[in-house]
Amino acid sequence: MEHFRELFEMSQKENKGLTFWIGGQTVGGGVLKFNAETVEVKSQQYRRVIIRISAIDAVAAM
């Protein structure tokens, strides 16, 4: 979680997007907020997406 947290904070502060891999699918977006259990992101397609951190397989900075 600590490595994910670093990317979440970077995305939130710098308004940079991340790509999340979840069960073989990808979701892209910028972090709005996060806590110990979830991360909330927005994208061009969706205004609000809430992802369970326990479901995330990988995260990459765009």
Task: Tell where the protein language model's regions lie, with residue ranges.
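Short glycine-rich, low-complexity segments
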Residues: 1-28, 35-38, 42-62
